[in-house]
Amino acid sequence: MAKSFYRYLLRFRHGHQEDPVVRFANGAYEDHSFPKGSTDYEELSGYLELNGDYLESMVVFDELWEQFLHEA
């Protein structure tokens, strides 16, 4: 089974709070409705556009998504 984006994102949780990636990871961790098992870009981006108040910019997600695909 492929690792979910959420599992990938958690590796960034403990870092400098000024980093938007760290804030995204911490926000997703605190978001109990985040689609934790998803590996689908459309599902994740749609969810974040509607519910990701903790995400500074969708660019942060898009860049992490590219890294996730590269490392998967």
UniProtKB/Swiss-Prot annotation:
<protein>
    <recommendedName>
        <fullName>UPF0346 protein GK1571</fullName>
    </recommendedName>
</protein>
<dbReference type="InterPro" id="IPR036806">
    <property type="entry name" value="YozE_SAM-like_sf"/>
</dbReference>
<dbReference type="Pfam" id="PF06855">
    <property type="entry name" value="YozE_SAM_like"/>
</dbReference>
<comment type="similarity">
    <text>Belongs to the UPF0346 family.</text>
</comment>
<dbReference type="InterPro" id="IPR023089">
    <property type="entry name" value="YozE_SAM-like"/>
</dbReference>
<dbReference type="InterPro" id="IPR010673">
    <property type="entry name" value="UPF0346"/>
</dbReference>
